[in-house]
Amino acid sequence: MINQENNDLYDLNEALQVENLTLNDYEEICKRLKKKPNRTELGMFGVMWSEHCCYRNSKPLLSKFPTKGKNVLVGPGENAGVIDVGNNQKLVFKIESHNHPSAIEPFQGAATGVGGILRDIFTMGARPIAVLNSLRFGNLDKSSNVDLLRGVVSGIAHYGNCVGVPTVGGEIDFDDSYSGNPLVNVMALGLLETEEIVCSGAKNVGSPVLYVGNTTGRDGVGGASFASSELTTTSLDDRPAVQVGDPFVEKSLIEACLDAFKTGDVIAAQDMGAAGLTCSSAEMAANGNLGISIDLDLVPSREDDMSSYQYLLSESQERMLFVVKEEKINDLIEKFNKWGLYASVIGEVIGTNEVIISHKGKIVAQIPTSALSDDTPVNFHNVINNPPDDLLNKWEWKENDLPEIHEQKIFSLKENKKFSFQEIILKLLSNPSIASKRWIYKQYDSQVQANTVFKPGKSDAAVVRLREQYKKNKSKVFSGVAASVDCNSRWVALDPFRGSIAAVAESARNVSCVGAEPVAITNNLNFSSPESEIGYWQLSSSCNGITEACKALETPVTGGNVSLYNESKNKDNLITPINPTPVIGMVGKIDNIEKAISCEWKNIDDQIWLIGSYKSDTTIAASSYLEYFHGEITGRPPKIDLLDEKFCQSFLRNAILNSLVVSSHDISDGGLAIALAESCILSAKGATIELKKDINREDNLLFAEGGSRIIFSINKIKQNEWLNYLKQNQINFPSSVYVKKIGHVSSETLKINIQDKNICNIRVEELSEKFNNSISDYF
């Protein structure tokens, strides 16, 4: 037992287990403090030294990312990244995860995930203008996964709809690896409303520290430590570690904070997210190279007899911490009270670099700021030199391993019978990972604020008008921003390096497909335990891939989130890790949103074209077709030639800006056939496609993935203009990039011919039925 001067008795081994700390950590803490920590101090170290707060396992890998660029104003280190989007406007954006809380309390876990990322945005002085989400669940044939999906979607919808921020897009995938550990990643965008970016570093010794927002309770205590450990069969007992959100308080907080920031009387701001008051005070002090003292007796609370430990580790929602001008404190408190928010001076900035906490007249914690924030432990791991043997074996897979095609039919290794290509297209369209997510996004308010250009599902990336709502300017606003979240986790599982390159490339491609220029990314690295040899190799390889792609595409990393220990343990102590899932949130700028285009065909007889790269692999390996039709997750994912990728995107964007291209859609899950079908479904128009059999297998032509490929349509009245444009630009084409006409838009049927033989003739109505009802049928 440890006995401290404040009679704080605790069992050391039990306390270390609760705080997810090691004995080595404890010895290091004693060295930093030059004494043994009391229970409150140990709890503060527990959350601040967790992976969630200090990235102790991933920090060496994150340092490789490119973080500077011509448009980047604020990179990693602040609450969110900031880029210049022109016209004296600044976009603030970030992605965060709420995986473990959503696993045990899906509604509140997802809802507070939305609330937390919104606070990161408006803490910088920006009004939130859009939310996107990237979700992963186990397959829906298991009822518990259906319940998780229902709860998470309801939570996102509830919070986003009530707070008045549109949910404009996202992605969702289903795989058994997520059955015990779903992923809930939320990305938010905001438009700066203040003259200066509001930063988090404390300034001016003696300045008051102001607490604003909701009261503090016991909900969410230890949430950061909980988020940094694996899920087990007893994780439901950790429900108190899940926060409870109130979107109506958040709405008041947004308006009050932006109002206060515009006065210039707020010196620094930090939201109370993970690790609550501990993290916000420590980071403000460290970022300002000063200290902070706090009296917990002054903190507005909603429960009686809370301990100092509970005050400091509570993750009650909708709370902020400010450093403010002393002479303006009364004006600010009055402003916040007007919005129905609690506002109380709870401390001050001090000259010594430490966080000092008082409670009931006694100092209960006194810790150097560097020990909590800057100089936190780093766990170094050895990276294996070669990929695991099971992956090397899978990379040996060849398309010739599949059954031969006879009379336009192929034998399914999964279902042990033959199917026509027409039947395969319908089967792929009905797979929940490919099918329409309409059941999900119809629950979201995507039109609130009246700036959403395309409804969810209509375009490869969301497009939002950059209208400054606080200005009473009635002139029309043309500038906009595009955003997309992407990751093919099957590819990353089979090759973390190639798969992560592909995730960056696809997110940029989606942004380019609407006519926007990719500018920067935020990423959410969802991985299993870094203590596993393979788990850390996956994380390291993924970071290398992201680094290479971001450098080549000139899309620097402005920040993000790392979520490790995403694995579940069953009653037999068998661990199931998730597929590694590095979600890329890409943002791009577009000068004129009237030029932006969607995936839908526009006019009958418009020409359909295909652009792609011969250097970028086009293969059935690692494809949706191989998994969903043949039941095999194998093969090496396609290699992407990033120079060709960049050229294809740039060429397409310029054609869109010249009003020649009227629709475009990237080829991803399911290959060319599914991309064509989706454009048909979205427009309720057909397509007649003529393909040459320049390879041995028809299923490669139809269902192969990769190749940096995009289908697009040319307005029928601009076909000569398009051909002239193409001829003028042909001289700049790399020899490995091709652009070819493959068909035209028709009325009611998707008709695909290969070498003049018809292999598909499906009415759009039948395509739509399979595509639109797959997920909703589970409810």
From Swiss-Prot:
It comes from the Bacteria. The keyword Magnesium applies. InterPro entries: PRibForGlyAmidine_synth_PurL, PurL_linker, PurM-like_C_dom, PurM-like_C_sf, PurM-like_N, PurM-like_N_sf. Keywords: ATP-binding, Cytoplasm, Ligase, Magnesium, Metal-binding, Nucleotide-binding, Purine biosynthesis. Pathway: Purine metabolism; IMP biosynthesis via de novo pathway; 5-amino-1-(5-phospho-D-ribosyl)imidazole from N(2)-formyl-N(1)-(5-phospho-D-ribosyl)glycinamide: step 1/2. It catalyses: N(2)-formyl-N(1)-(5-phospho-beta-D-ribosyl)glycinamide + L-glutamine + ATP + H2O = 2-formamido-N(1)-(5-O-phospho-beta-D-ribosyl)acetamidine + L-glutamate + ADP + phosphate + H(+). Mg(2+) 2 binds at D120, D271. One of its GO terms (cellular component) is cytoplasm. Mg(2+) 1 binds at E96, N561. Its EC number is 6.3.5.3. ATP binds at Y55, K94, N523, G560. Substrate binds at S97, H98, N99, H100, R119, Q243, E315, S316, Q317, S563. It is an enzyme of class 6 (ligase). It holds the Pfam family FGAR-AT_linker. Belongs to the FGAMS family. Part of the phosphoribosylformylglycinamidine synthase complex involved in the purines biosynthetic pathway. Catalyzes the ATP-dependent conversion of formylglycinamide ribonucleotide (FGAR) and glutamine to yield formylglycinamidine ribonucleotide (FGAM) and glutamate. The FGAM synthase complex is composed of three subunits. PurQ produces an ammonia molecule by converting glutamine to glutamate. PurL transfers the ammonia molecule to FGAR to form FGAM in an ATP-dependent manner. This is Phosphoribosylformylglycinamidine synthase subunit PurL. It comes from Prochlorococcus marinus (strain MIT 9301). The lineage of its organism: Bacteria, Bacillati, Cyanobacteriota, Cyanophyceae, Synechococcales.
